[in-house]
Amino acid sequence: MKTVSVFGSTGAIGQMIIDIIFSELDKYQVKVLVAKSNIQLLAFQAKLVNAERVVITDVNLYRELKDLLLDTNIKVSAGDDGMIMATSLDVDYAMMAIVGIAALVPMTYLINSNVKVIALANKESIVCGGALLLSLAKEKDVKIIPLDSEHNAIYQILADKGHKDLEKITLTASGGPLLSMDYEQMKYVTVQDTVKHPVWKMGKKISVDSATMINKSLEIIEAYYLFSIKAEKLDVIIHNESVVHGIISYIDGTSIAFMSVPDMKIPIMYSLSWPNRSAALCKKLNLALYNQLTFMKPDIYKFPGIKLGFEVLKTSNVHANGIILNAANEIAVNAFLAKKIGFLDIVNIVYETLNLVNYGRINSLSNILDCDAISRKVASSTIDKLC
C-alpha cells in the first residue's frame, strides 16, 4: 500500500486526485489532506478516503473544522505549523495541487523531507523555483512528475526515449475559451466568458490563464527547466481537440506524439502508479470518433500573452524574469476576477511589470520571495493607476 499526501485537495485537480484514490482505496493510505478554506469539502474528503490528518491553512477555520470531524479519529492542524507538519510526514507520494507560488515553500519542505515522488500540478513553483528547486530535488533524490497534461506527455516520452537526437519539443494548446473571438470582441470579455473552458475542467485562475494563453508562456518556462531544454528547441501549436498533448521531434525528421482523451485523470493515474501503469479509470482514446484533428500556429496579435515565455527565455536573467511574469500575472488575474480591470489589461500589466522590475540574480529562496513581493507591489500599483 502506497502512502500519499494531497496538498490542495479541495481544488479542481485535488478533487480529481481524491476521486482516483477513493476508487482504488485498497492501494493507498492517505496520511494528510491540506486545503486553504473549504472546510466542508475537506471534512467530507477526509472521511471518504480515511485520511489520518487534515490541515486547513486558514487558522480562523480550525475550530469549525475540528467540530466537523468530532465523530472521527482524524487529527486536525492549521496554519503554518500545520503545513510544516504535513510536509514533514514520511510518505511515498506527495500530490501538490496548491495554486500559484503559494506551493513553492511547501515544495521546498517536501523535497527536504523523506518523500520519494512529488506529483506536481503547479507550474508556478517550477517557474519561480527554477534551477534552485530542481537542483535540490536532484540532491535529495526526489522525483518530480509533472501533472500538466502537456508536460506529463513529454515526461512519458522522454522517460522511454531520452534526449538523444532530440530536435524540438512542441507543447499543444487548446486555444482556450476565446479562440474563435476576434480582437475587437475580446475587449468586452467577461469573467464568465473566460471560465467556460471548452475542453478542460479547471479552476478560475487557470481558466483565465488559458484564455490569455499566459498559461502556455508559464508552461514554456516550466519545460525549459524540467527537461533541461534550450529555448530554441521549444514550440507551441494550437490543437483545439486536445487529443495530442505533446510532440517530440527528432533530427531525422520523425516525431512522436503523445495522445489520449483530454482527461486530467490520466496524468494523475500515471503519477500515482509510477513506475508502473494502472488500468484506465476514464474513457480510452478512439480516433474513429474524431472526424479530424486540427493544428494551427498561435495568433500572436490576438494572444500576445503566448509570447511572454519565449521573451523571458531570451533574457540574461531567466529566473528573476520568470518570477516577475508569474507574480504580475497572479495579481492581474485576481484583479480581473474581481472586475477591477478588463481582460486585455491582464497582458498589458504583465508586460509593464516586466519592464519596471529589474531584479538581480536569484541565489536563494529568500531572493525568490523578495523578487515575487516586489513584482506584486509594482503590478498592484500599475492596476491602481488604471482604476
Swiss-Prot record:
NADPH binds at residues 10-11, 13, 38, 122, 124, 203. One of its GO terms (biological process) is isopentenyl diphosphate biosynthetic process, methylerythritol 4-phosphate pathway involved in terpenoid biosynthetic process. The keyword Oxidoreductase applies. Its EC number is 1.1.1.267. Keywords: Isoprene biosynthesis, Manganese, Metal-binding, NADP, Oxidoreductase. GO terms for molecular function: 1-deoxy-D-xylulose-5-phosphate reductoisomerase activity; manganese ion binding; NADPH binding. The keyword Transferase does not apply. 1-deoxy-D-xylulose 5-phosphate binds at residues 123, 149-150, 174, 197, 210, 215-216, 219. It is an enzyme of class 1 (oxidoreductase). It catalyses: 2-C-methyl-D-erythritol 4-phosphate + NADP(+) = 1-deoxy-D-xylulose 5-phosphate + NADPH + H(+). Pathway: Isoprenoid biosynthesis; isopentenyl diphosphate biosynthesis via DXP pathway; isopentenyl diphosphate from 1-deoxy-D-xylulose 5-phosphate: step 1/6. It holds the Pfam family DXP_redisom_C. Its cofactor is Mg(2+); Mn(2+). InterPro entries: DXP_reductoisomerase, DXP_reductoisomerase_C, DXP_reductoisomerase_N, DXPR_C, DXPR_C_sf, NAD(P)-bd_dom_sf. It comes from the Bacteria. Mn(2+) binds at residues 148, 150, 219. Belongs to the DXR family. PANTHER family: 1-DEOXY-D-XYLULOSE 5-PHOSPHATE REDUCTOISOMERASE, 1-DEOXY-D-XYLULOSE 5-PHOSPHATE REDUCTOISOMERASE, CHLOROPLASTIC. Catalyzes the NADPH-dependent rearrangement and reduction of 1-deoxy-D-xylulose-5-phosphate (DXP) to 2-C-methyl-D-erythritol 4-phosphate (MEP). NCBIfam families: Dxr. This is 1-deoxy-D-xylulose 5-phosphate reductoisomerase.
